[in-house]
A protein has these predicted regions:
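Structured loops at beta-to-helix junctions and adjacent beta-edge loops in soluble globular domains
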Residues: 135-137, 180, 268
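Catalytic "initiation/cleavage/transfer" segments centered on a nucleophilic residue
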Residues: 35-41, 48-74, 94-125, 197-287
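"Short basic amphipathic alpha-helical interaction patches in structured regions
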Residues: 148-149, 192, 205-208
Length: 287
């Protein structure tokens, strides 16, 4: 695969939303639309489930009866469809897109509430817990060769290792993960691991060892961000909001900060982090 699937899907979504909001036909409208359709056709998989706006392109592909390899010919055929007609078609899918986004936000709120409940229970059960956070992604130079099936497969392997408590995962008392898609990061995962505080103390070291496992799973295409690096932790320590690392049950501020910090797992800074494609409708993005 030579196309960056993640970036293309975000570009298509932004394009459809832009066209939907236009008052008049933009310059090179048919050329841009034909280019995106051809690129989308190159990555399209009929077995996949596409989010919201992307479904508009799926329907257009089904209707077009010429070879999508010729952009000029496709642009000519698209000119038989007026800008207003295509804009109305997009409007239908944008409405569905907005409904799905509302459903997504509701699901995020539910996931957040469940995770907070689980972590509150853990913090009450143990006198101290070690909360480890890291982000797993792919090196930018490999984004063009990693599609949603690769990401799903890599995550399945990692989750199985966690579930089996192999190696560094031995002794886990709680864990959570969230799959996302971003403009810069591409496909990525926020990972939370929780250990008994009297058995483990080095959160940074654990995150580093997990990153090595991720690199092996991804054949060295994977990269990571260790949330326990001193530079990253210092900014939260200075603000008195540090909520990862060693958390003591008898310190209400630490527990409170921890419960706030873990919400980032399913509530990223930007709302546009949802997956635009899944290998199937029931593909899990949180657990």
């Amino acid at each position: 695969m030579n196309t960056n699937e993640s970036a293309l899907l975000i570009e298509i979504e932004n394009y459809i939303l832009e066209i939907y909001n236009r008052k008049s036909k933009p310059k090179d409208f048919y050329d841009d639309l034909s280019r995106l359709l051809i690129e989308f056709n190159g990555i399209y998989n009929s077995d996949y489930s596409y989010f919201g706006c992307i479904e508009a392109f799926v329907e257009l592909l089904r209707e077009l009866n010429i070879c999508l390899g010729c952009q000029g010919e496709l642009a000519q055929q698209l000119k038989n469809l007026s800008f207003k007609y295509i804009q109305c078609r997009f409007e239908f899918y944008v409405s569905r897109h907005k409904r799905k986004l509302r459903d997504h936000r509701y699901s995020e709120n539910e996931n957040t509430a469940q995770l907070v409940k689980r972590m509150r229970t853990v913090s009450q059960r143990y006198s101290r817990i070690l909360v480890v956070r890291l982000d797993l992604a792919y090196k930018k130079k490999y984004h063009h060769s990693v599609d949603i099936a690769d990401f799903d497969n890599d995550m399945r392997i990692l989750r199985q290792r966690i579930h089996n408590q192999d190696g560094i995962f031995k002794g886990l008392i709680e864990y959570a993960w969230a799959l996302e898609q971003g403009t810069e990061k591409g496909y990525h995962c926020h990972l939370l691991l929780v250990y008994k505080g009297h058995e483990h103390k080095n959160a940074y070291g654990i995150a580093e060892r997990v990153s090595e496992i991720w690199k092996k799973i991804t054949f060295n295409q994977g990269c990571y961000f260790n949330c326990h690096s001193p530079e990253y932790l210092n900014q939260f320590e200075e603000q008195g909001t540090l909520g990862i690392g060693m958390i003591h049950r008898n310190d209400p501020d630490q527990v409170g900060n921890m419960l706030k910090a873990i919400q980032y797992l399913v509530r990223p800074e930007k709302e546009e982090q949802y997956l635009r494609v899944k290998v199937c409708k029931r593909m899990r993005t949180f657990g």
